[in-house]
Amino acid sequence: MALTNRLLMNSSALLRSSTLPLAVTSSRQAHAAHNTVINFVPQQEAWVVERMGKFYKILEPGLNFLLPIIDKIKFVQNLREIAIEIPEQGAITIDNVQLRLDGVLYLRVFDPYKASYGVDDPEFAVTQLAQTTMRSEVGKINLDTVFKERELLNENIVFAINKASAPWGIQCMRYEIRDMQMPSKIQEAMQMQVEAERKKRAAILESEGIREAAINRAEGDKKSAILASEAVQAERINVAKGEAEAVILKAESRAKAIERIALALEKDGGANAAGLTVAEQYVGAFGNLAKESNTVVLPANLSDPGSMVSQALAVYDSLSNKKK
């Protein structure tokens, strides 16, 4: 019993002597790990163990056992994604515009061994790499591209960081440019450019409105002219139809009159009546000539009405003989 108590006391002393806080060089230490026999590794952490000063193994989350005298927890790596603020720095674009930029870098450890032995201070190294990469990428483009294609710029920075930080066991998930400052003169020039662009758009909209109004007026005038011409055409057609119908009616009336005259001539005494009518019209025609101031050649026997009637009858007889 005494021997057992003595062994327990020695073991307790040994455990107390091995629970000294560990000086972890990584700044992503979740808590102070202790060199004990029984160790509980939290989730999303990796403990790097050295045995007699040489890398031994990496403790996975859960229950782990170590030998406190010869084993030592050297590094505690946080496997969760973390955000690092990138300090403000200067950069010059390809068109010689000086900018002041800062950002946020999101990264995680994917290889605890490389993160522990590949670089002394991973966070500091990645921060410096992000700054130099951002200056390099900004120097390849002009100011307008920096504003228009910021997402592409972020992607290029992430690609360059991952390419350089692969031996460190660190992966850059994304990079975001947070703030961007430029000289006051450049800001004033950009403001003037914005105002000019607004005025240009306003002028374009106004000219388009004037053009649309002119087109609408022209379309209205065109339709009005078409309607007016159609109205004139319809009026002329109606007048022509009226005149044609009048001519047809006159011709039909004339034909009916001639037909009746022909029927009358076939009756007894019709020829004498027709001759008398012709003689009357003949004499009347000469009477009308006397009313006008025209120069005409008259027959010599104009003063003899009987001879004029005889001439009229002779004309009628000659016409009648021709028909026969």
UniProtKB/Swiss-Prot annotation:
One of the record's GO cellular component terms: membrane raft
Family: Belongs to the band 7/mec-2 family.
Cell compartments where the protein resides: Mitochondrion
Function of the protein: Mitochondrial protein that probably regulates the biogenesis and the activity of mitochondria. In neurons, involved in mitochondrial fusion and recovery of normal locomotory behavior during reoxygenation; probably acts independently of egl-9 and the canonical hypoxia response pathway.
Tissue expression: Widely expressed in most tissues, including body wall muscles, intestinal epithelia, and pharynx and head neurons.
Entry protein name: Stomatin-like protein stl-1
Provenance organism: Caenorhabditis elegans
UniProt key word Cell division: no
PANTHER family: STOMATIN-LIKE PROTEIN 2, MITOCHONDRIAL
Induction: Induced by anoxia. Induced by paraquat, a chemical causing production of reactive oxygen species (ROS).
A GO biological-process term: mitochondrion organization
InterPro entries reported in the protein's UniProt record: Band7/mec-2_domain (IPR050710), Band_7 (IPR001107), Band_7/SPFH_dom_sf (IPR036013), STML2-like_C (IPR032435), Stomatin_HflK_fam (IPR001972)
Keywords: Mitochondrion
Annotated Gene3D superfamilies: Band 7 domain (3.30.479.30)
Main location: mitochondrion
Recorded superkingdom: Eukaryota
